[in-house]
From Swiss-Prot:
Species of the source: Burkholderia cenocepacia (strain HI2424)
Enzyme Commission (EC) number: 3.6.4.-
Catalyzed reactions per annotation: ATP + H2O = ADP + phosphate + H(+)
Keyword Glycosyltransferase: no
Tree of life domain: Bacteria
Protein name stated in the entry: Holliday junction branch migration complex subunit RuvB
Residues that coordinate or bind Mg(2+): 76
Length: 356
């Protein structure tokens, strides 16, 4: 991906990844601190309540936890909540940072009893580091090499019992041996508008922003099912309201603010619309191959596949078929277009998920 594409992708207001270190600081201030305050993911939350309480009653570390799902849904927040509910310390790192076995060994040997080690992007661990992790997870021991050459020898170190919480957006990239060592595996799902509305109201309260239920719902409906996006939109709408509406966030104020930001009623921005409009107007609704589509809109193939398409497919606006990408009936309706008869009759032929 060229730098301009990367910059445009990272600066999207509806991007699910953190835009900057400043935004990460802002997110930390809004994070719930206990399970009772955590909105959504009821099934996961209910399971963790049971497992955490059972571990505390037995004075044991919680079993190792794998959290996976799209970015921005609260995996890091849950890791912090787990540590707080267990009453232990949390040590945080990420897969790409742990380049050498010694990096991981230094972390593990400094953990206190029952502490939580949180590894974000755990699918990006190097094979060397992963090999060190296996005995640590199973037996609370690690083997380290001392010395070099013929004089090198392996020394086994005992570790304090601990809980590993791993987070990933790409569970399929985890190796089977690593995945099998997690006793608790939880998938986080996209949030519905009502859940996001509750998150927006809670965040607004923490920010001392005046918002009514309809204003919160308007923001929630455009947040693409993602709390991180909802909180980011809230910040921008709050700015707009303070300048244009005496600080009061109503549905009309939120609508005007988000229209100014080019975020439409279903959460599409200019890049989403550019892709869908290219399929509709340049390729008659599709099918169109990914390389032709990338050339038509001036984006890299990887940007389309990894950044733009997932939400459009998940929401039913785009299909991947063996013959290429196809705009759905929902897309025609969204842009106020009538569906050509040819699209209606050919639709069944394209109704497969694996088109390239």
């Amino acid at each position: 991906m060229i730098e301009t594409d990367k910059l445009a992708t990272e600066q999207r207001i509806i991007a699910a990844t953190p835009a900057s270190s400043h935004e990460e600081v802002f997110e930390r201030a809004l994070r719930p601190r206990q399970l009772d305050d955590y909105v959504g993911q009821e099934k996961v939350r209910g399971q963790l309540e049971i497992f955490i309480e059972a571990a505390k009653r037995r004075s044991e570390p919680l079993d190792h936890v794998l959290l996976f799902g799209p970015p921005g849904l609260g995996k890091t927040t849950l890791a912090h909540i787990i540590a707080r509910e267990m009453g232990v310390n949390l040590r945080q790192t990420s897969g790409p940072v742990l380049e050498r076995a010694g990096d991981l060994a230094a972390l593990l040997t400094n953990l206190e009893a029952n502490d939580v080690l949180f590894i974000d992007e755990i699918h990006r661990l190097s094979p060397v580091v992963e090999e060190i992790l296996y005995p640590a997870l199973e037996d609370y021991q690690i083997d380290i090499m001392i010395g070099e050459g013929p004089a090198a020898r392996s020394v086994k170190l005992d570790l304090q019992p601990f809980t590993l919480v791993g987070a990933t957006t790409r569970a399929g990239m985890l190796t089977n041996p690593l995945r099998d060592r997690f006793g608790i595996v939880a998938r986080l799902e996209f949030y519905d508008a009502e859940q996001l509305s509750r998150i927006v109201r809670r965040s607004a309260s923490l920010l001392n922003a005046q918002i009514d239920p309809n204003g919160a719902l308007e923001i929630a409906k455009r947040a693409r099912g993602t709390p991180r996006i909802a909180n980011r939109l809230l910040r921008r709408v709050r700015d707009f309201a303070e300048v244009k509406a005496d600080g009061q966030i109503t549905a009309a104020v939120a609508d005007a603010a988000l229209a100014m930001l080019d975020v439409d009623p279903v959460g599409f921005d200019l890049m989403d619309r550019k892709l869908l409009e290219a399929i509709l107007y340049k390729f008659d609704g599709g099918p169109v191959g990914i390389d032709n589509l990338a050339a038509a809109i001036g984006e890299e193939r990887d940007t389309i596949e990894d950044v733009l398409e997932p939400y459009l497919i998940q929401q039913g606006f785009l299909q991947r078929t063996p013959r290429g990408r196809v705009a759905t009936l929902l897309t025609y309706r969204h842009f106020g277009l009538s569906v050509p008869d040819a699209r209606r009759t050919e639709r069944d032929e394209w109704d497969t998920p694996d088109g390239k």
